């Protein structure tokens, strides 16, 4: 499949269909892996109660046609339990989001994310008519001065350093609104019992969508964590303690999933752990003509022919998106900036050497999903026995 400036909308539809089908394939109930060539770990677990894993977590890496560095997008979607087609809604959210990021990658990161998130909202709304939906949390790294994050729903983004843990995202729940606007100093769990943890907005909602944007700098010596509510239910304090006592991203991700199971495993639990500084150093290593997508269970590679998008194709896409997107315009945004400078390192090697290095990294970084099987995977008696 070739994607580029002279491509038709059909090529992006094919890209979307392939990513969606791959994300929605049947998998075992739990897996954890370190993403080859990137200092990222992703993990998911069905838990001990749910019959279906409606979480999706994945990483996208490709070289935008108009830019000199690769773009890495880490995203997590949590299909809404109890609503129609939660698992498919999450798959549709991520596949649409990734496709639109590739399509609009020539724009600024925030403009690109805005278009991609609104398109994902339209896609889920079209299928489920407001009766199904998903959260969406994403982190984008492209070598810019700041790292851009975005979220809709109650999946979270945390910044982690030796100094502690900071929530960078904003929860779209009744509990969070009550705490924000009533200035009452209670823990989130107390708010949930008083006001409920219902989402006030999500991907697939039939109303104005407010996307929460955050700009951060690289947490020196730290990491960024994306988590579904089934994972961060263990509490910020425990998330921080586990980080302080974990030697790498894979071990940290595994321990979060395991502790969520020890807490009862009442919901699906998924995380992505990102060593930002390590990724920033590798953005000069080109993905070439390949779009890479990873989830906790495997890797997908798609051919991409990078060219500058033509105004003609952009106008076609804009007119097609315009009707529904106007209804779901973004209102506002939030910006947070930490005071830590990021470091970048230039690379000066030819294409063949780069390819060899990437192959070597692929061989060195093995999937640890089978070696580090989670607590719930070892002890749960639910599900298809053939999956174990």
Where do the language-model regions lie?
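PP2C/PPM-type serine/threonine phosphatase catalytic domain
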Residues: 1-388
């Amino acid at each position: 499949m070739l994607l580029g400036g002279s491509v038709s909308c059909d090529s992006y539809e094919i890209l979307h269909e392939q990513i969606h089908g791959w994300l929605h394939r049947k998998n075992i109930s739990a897996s954890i892996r370190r993403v080859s060539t990137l200092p990222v770990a992703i993990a998911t677990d069905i838990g001990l109660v749910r019959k279906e894993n409606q979480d999706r977590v994945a990483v996208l890496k490709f070289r935008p046609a108009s830019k000199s560095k690769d773009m890495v997008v880490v995203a997590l979607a949590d299909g809404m339990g109890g609503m129609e087609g939660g698992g498919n809604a999450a798959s549709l959210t991520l596949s649409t989001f990734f496709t639109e990021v590739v399509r609009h990658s020539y724009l600024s990161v925030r403009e690109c994310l805005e278009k991609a998130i609104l398109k994902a909202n339209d896609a889920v709304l079209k299928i489920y008519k407001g009766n199904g939906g998903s959260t969406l949390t994403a982190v984008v790294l492209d070598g810019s001065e700041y790292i851009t994050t975005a979220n809709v729903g109650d999946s979270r983004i945390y910044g982690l350093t030796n100094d502690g843990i900071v929530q960078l995202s904003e929860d779209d729940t009744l509990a969070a609104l009550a705490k924000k606007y009533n200035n009452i100093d209670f823990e989130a769990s107390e708010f949930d019992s008083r006001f409920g943890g219902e989402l006030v907005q999500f991907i697939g909602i039939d109303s104005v969508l407010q996307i929460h944007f955050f700009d951060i700098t690289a947490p020196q010596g730290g990491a960024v964590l994306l988590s579904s509510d089934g994972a961060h239910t263990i509490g910020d304090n425990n998330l921080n303690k586990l980080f302080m006592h974990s030697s790498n991203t894979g071990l940290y991700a595994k321990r979060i999933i395991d502790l969520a199971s020890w807490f009862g495993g009442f919901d699906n639990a998924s995380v992505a752990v990102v060593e930002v500084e390590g990724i920033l150093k590798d953005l000069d290593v080109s993905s070439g003509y390949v779009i890479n997508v990873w989830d906790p269970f495997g890797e997908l590679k798609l051919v991409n022919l990078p060219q500058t998008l033509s105004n003609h194709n952009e106008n076609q896409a804009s007119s097609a998106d315009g009707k529904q997107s106007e209804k779901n315009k973004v209102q506002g945004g939030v910006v947070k900036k930490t005071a830590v400078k990021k470091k970048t390192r230039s690379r000066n090697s030819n294409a063949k050497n780069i390819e060899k290095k990437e192959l070597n990294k692929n061989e060195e970084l093995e999937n640890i999903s089978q070696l580090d099987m989670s607590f719930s995977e070892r002890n749960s008696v639910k599900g298809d026995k053939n999956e174990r």
